[in-house]
Amino acid sequence: MCSSDLVSKGFEGKERTDMEGLLKAGAAGFTDDGIPLMDGMFVKEAMEEAARLDTVLSFHEEDKTFIKQNGINHGKVSEQLGIYGSPALAEDSLVARDCMIALATGARIDIQHISSGHSVEMVRLAKKMGANVWAEVTPHHFTLTEDAVLEHGTLAKMNPPLRTDRKSVV
């Protein structure tokens, strides 16, 4: 059985867990799943430790400083509803940062549930540069667009939100 453990104690992004001890106890990798790690130096140090231990880090990439209302893309639908939403920049900025840190540290990283075509391109570029980075996309992000919010209401709200170009993440 494989399981992952937290990168940071209590999902707070301030103090790293004992990755070495957790690996010995059976952890297969590390993630603060659903909680973006905002402190770049913390991420760099976690990646250095992960590279030393030859383990994987998995990241949820949404910079909350760009987000006013999470769960819906900042675009035509959010404007129609009078909501600012979450721009792709919130994801793109952390993907770019973490791809470059992975390249610099030699860490293996996974970008979780990618939703932006620009983020996909950054992952591809980082791989070409030699970074050991990959990403996954959920079925709803490559089959639906932000228009689903108009049809399904809050059932179509998620983090990261559905974007405008579903084909760009394939």
Region spans (language model):
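Short, small-residue-biased leader/transition segments that mark boundaries at the very start
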Residues: 1-3
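Active-site beta->alpha loop and helix N-cap motifs at the rims of alpha/beta catalytic domains
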Residues: 8-12
